[in-house]
């Protein structure tokens, strides 16, 4: 992704689980490193599925990151000479991430955010809708529906093989749920 010279900007990579959001974030960060740009990658501390320290894609690609408890901590840990900032699992951050990302971009830095645009209910997730609104570049990518093989834009949460209910909590840490990519037609959220 190429942006204006001597200006900061925001990029968002959004989509359902298994669409390659983290792989795309890692790819963009690696390209910046090849170009000798200073990079820093942040992720929410609660994302410890594959690694506590690294951002790891489902395919196993990984890149070193700084786990943070809140979006405010990104500013505290951001180094002065960083050119490109990556933020994975942006949906798990609080709404102040939008203001923080804007502040960073306004200081002539490139910010790349990756995350789920919708929760398992098919509703906008965390700060992602606002990030997509203020970003200069937005890529909404799809996975493949596990039921019908059409393009998937939603994440289906399954508990013991059955769709999670609308009343279930949006974020479940360490629970025995699983996820599948689904298209609009095959996505189910029972009441």
Curated annotation (Swiss-Prot):
Subcellular location field: Cytoplasm
InterPro entries: P-loop_NTPase (IPR027417), Thymidine_kinase (IPR001267), Thymidine_kinase_CS (IPR020633)
EC number(s) from the headed UniProt entry: 2.7.1.21
Keyword Cytoplasm assigned: yes
List of residues binding Zn(2+): 145, 148, 183, 186
A Pfam family of this chain: TK
GO biological process: DNA biosynthetic process; thymidine metabolic process
Main location: cytoplasm
UniProt binding sites for ATP: 15-22, 88-91
GO annotations of cellular component type: cytosol
Leader sequence segment: none
Gene Ontology MF terms: ATP binding; thymidine kinase activity; zinc ion binding
Record keywords, A-Z: ATP-binding, Cytoplasm, DNA synthesis, Kinase, Metal-binding, Nucleotide-binding, Transferase, Zinc
Kinase is among the record's keywords: yes
Highest taxon above the source species: Bacteria
Enzyme type, top EC level: transferase
Catalyzed reactions per annotation: thymidine + ATP = dTMP + ADP + H(+)
Residues at the catalytic site: 89
Record-linked SUPFAM superfamilies: Glucocorticoid receptor-like (DNA-binding domain), P-loop containing nucleoside triphosphate hydrolases
Family: Belongs to the thymidine kinase family.
Subunit description: Homotetramer.
This protein's name: Thymidine kinase
């Amino acid at each position: 992704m190429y942006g204006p010279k001597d200006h900061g900007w925001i990029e968002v990579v959004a989509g359902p689980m298994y669409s390659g959001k983290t792989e795309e974030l890692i790819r963009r960060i690696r390209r910046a490193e090849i170009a000798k740009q200073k990079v820093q990658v942040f992720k929410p501390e609660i994302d410890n599925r594959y690694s506590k320290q690294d951002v790891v894609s489902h395919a196993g690609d990984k890149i070193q990151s700084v786990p943070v408890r809140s979006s405010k901590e990104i500013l505290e840990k951001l180094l002065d000479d960083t050119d490109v900032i990556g933020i994975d699992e942006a949906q798990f951050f609080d709404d102040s991430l939008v203001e923080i990302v804007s502040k960073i971009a306004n200081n002539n830095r490139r910010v790349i955010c990756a995350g789920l645009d919708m929760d398992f209910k098919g509703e906008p997730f965390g700060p992602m809708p606002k990030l997509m609104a203020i970003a200069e570049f937005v890529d909404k990518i799809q996975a493949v529906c596990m039921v019908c093989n059409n393009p998937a834009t939603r994440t289906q949460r399954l508990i013991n093989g059955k769709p999670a209910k609308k009343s279930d909590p949006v974020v479940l840490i360490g629970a025995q749920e699983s996820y599948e990519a689904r298209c609009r037609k095959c996505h189910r959220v029972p009441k």
